[in-house]
Amino acid sequence: MKSVLGFKKAKANREKISMVTCYDYTLAKIINSTDIDCILVGDSGGMVLLGKKNTTYTTLDDMQFMTQAVANGATDKFIVADLPFMSYRQSLEITMQAVTTLIQSGAHAIKLEGSSGNLDIIKHIVNSGVPVMGHIGMTPQFINSFGGFKVQGRTEEAAKHLLEEAKLLEQAGCFGIVLECIPANIAKDITQNLDIPTIGIGAGSNTDGQILVLQDMLGMNTDFQPKFVKKYIDGSKLFSDAINTYVKETKANTFPTKEHCYDYC
């Protein structure tokens, strides 16, 4: 997927959209060689890459650093970058400075969380020439309001509110919406009532696409295994085994061998 137009085309053709998160150059280069449609430089990188407590601690400087790294590695992919916590809630000027920073760092679009209080901001960003992706449901930047990472939309009233939010985001100009940790039937209803694609994470299989944190799907984080994540490999074990093999060979002096040495060895 080369541009935001690919999202609209995929929705029209009923083609599923695949997305993963990425935060660094090395993994971005690998992803660039795959069939993945889109990369999200998520504020989750503050947790996954930098070890921060939650995404409210991720800064614009963090996002700039990660976006530049990913853009340098994934030169053929469409890149969306998260606006970090409070970067779009202080003033329009501060918001647009943050948007400019991420776009000039290599992002092709930005994502922000929630609808209430954001609609005029989204319209302004879109009218400024920057595509915007919405995000509703379990929005991690609102963790303190939610009282933790909890599934949203489990009551009739909450489900109705999510649909209303999605429609408002579409009307404001969003080209797509992430639906996070909501019941599958609610995600299906939202998807069927929008002309823009929905990207699910913990939202069932009836969304227009899926997104996962790369390190989660690669099994690199043994301490975080939510229900909605499928581990495609046991990355933690693969890496640990490789490192331990290197340690053993070093101590046994079986590495390096002649093939790893220059002529003077």
Swiss-Prot record:
Keywords carried by this UniProt record: Cytoplasm, Magnesium, Metal-binding, Pantothenate biosynthesis, Transferase
Protein name: 3-methyl-2-oxobutanoate hydroxymethyltransferase
GO molecular-function terms, A-Z: 3-methyl-2-oxobutanoate hydroxymethyltransferase activity; magnesium ion binding
The keyword Cell membrane is annotated on this UniProt entry: no
Transmembrane domains' residue ranges: none
Annotated metabolic or biological route of this protein: Cofactor biosynthesis; (R)-pantothenate biosynthesis; (R)-pantoate from 3-methyl-2-oxobutanoate: step 1/2
Family: Belongs to the PanB family.
NCBIfam families given in the database record: panB (TIGR00222), PRK00311.1 (NF001452)
EC number(s) given by UniProt: 2.1.2.11
